């Protein structure tokens, strides 16, 4: 049996019988496909299912997204993480409107010119929205290919990755009409059956042709990437309220943690925290240290110490915004800050 030729046939048949068919972005609309693909980068489907409909309701077309203020986009994105995706999403929408007349291009190379769209994302848009014979190669797909074809190599080696691209391209079905089912099948198989741990080999349509299974190498393929060391980063928050109880927020720099979101004044050293407070007329003795909280990012553990104060600085002492508690949800806040401010606050008076 020709494993390569039977791979696509098996996958398409399996997807149509057992794959996921109720995802809201499974429509021939390149805007919806693109939006979902960006959201799904490093984010679980279950999480995206919560954000996607709200985002689409607010921005039903690429034109409405392009015309929106970036702060509005970031506000809706808050909690999804990897905020550069939201900034790139906004820029890409403006590119589609400005450079392509508001119509998504159907060629992969053109799609790759959009901010935040790489080869695999562009291929997914081509396959789902335009039935183009373009292959995706995300983490789930790499795992499927490495196991079915017993491909062993350093996942961080560019030559090995290129060999997987070549393999993936050779497996594409011959009929353009099969591309949506084939592409969704790759995603579904990797996400629900050929899982990283505890794969469900008895449910896999490739079980009898899987080389890793024959060689008893399922657990070792694909090789694991060398995980970077998780670094602990201390942060200090200043929770400052004015006479009306509004909270001081500042916009974070575009680059770095929570880039572009609104946050309370946030610092990496205690000294910076004290210096900033003094500029607002708040002496360090009037800062009340609260119990620290932690928040895990991909390769960082944030150790956050909030400081509250009973002092009420003058509003003209800061370039930030004073936002009443009932309007905090209108701003894109980092999730740990949003969670913290929704807790019962200490009585300092």
Segments and roles (model prediction):
Residues 1-21, 26, 191-349:
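Intrinsically disordered, low-complexity, charged terminal extensions of DNA damage-control enzymes
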Residues 3, 8-202, 206-215, 219, ...:
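Catalytic cores of DNA base-excision repair glycosylases
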């Amino acid at each position: 049996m020709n494993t390569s030729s039977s791979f696509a046939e098996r996958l398409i048949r399996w997807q149509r019988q057992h794959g996921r068919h109720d995802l809201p972005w499974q429509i021939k609309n390149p805007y919806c496909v693109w939006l979902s693909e960006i959201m799904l980068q490093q984010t679980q489907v279950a999480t995206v299912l919560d954000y996607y409909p709200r985002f689409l309701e607010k921005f039903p077309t690429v034109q409405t997204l392009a015309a929106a203020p970036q702060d509005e986009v970031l506000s809706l994105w808050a909690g999804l993480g990897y905020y550069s995706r939201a900034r790139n999403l906004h820029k890409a929408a403006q590119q589609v409107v400005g450079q392509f007349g508001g119509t998504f291009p159907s060629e992969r190379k053109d799609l790759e010119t959009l901010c935040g769209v790489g080869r695999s994302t562009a291929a997914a848009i081509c396959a789902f929205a335009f039935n183009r014979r373009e292959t995706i190669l995300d983490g789930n797909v790499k795992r499927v290919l490495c196991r079915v074809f017993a491909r062993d190599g350093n996942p961080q080696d560019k030559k090995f990755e290129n060999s997987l691209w070549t393999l993936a391209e050779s497996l594409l079905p011959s009929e353009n009409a099969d591309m949506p089912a084939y592409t969704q099948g790759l995603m579904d198989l990797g996400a629900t059956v050929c899982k990283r741990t505890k794969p469900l080999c008895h449910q896999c349509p490739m079980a009898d042709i899987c080389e890793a299974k024959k060689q008893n190498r399922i657990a070792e393929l694909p090789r694991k990437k060398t995980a970077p060391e998780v670094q602990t980063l201390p942060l200090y928050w200043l929770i400052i309220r004015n006479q009306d109880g509004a909270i001081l927020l500042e916009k974070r720099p575009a680059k770095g943690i929570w880039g572009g979101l609104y946050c309370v004044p946030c610092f990496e050293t205690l000294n910076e925290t004290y210096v900033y407070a003094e500029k607002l007329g708040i002496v360090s003795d009037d800062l009340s240290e609260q119990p620290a909280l932690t928040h895990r990012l991909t390769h960082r553990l944030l150790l956050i110490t909030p400081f509250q104060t009973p002092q009420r600085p003058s509003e003209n002492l800061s370039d930030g915004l004073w936002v009443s508690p009932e309007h905090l949800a209108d701003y894109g806040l980092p999730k740990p800050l949003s969670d913290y401010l929704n807790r019962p606050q200490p009585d300092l008076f």
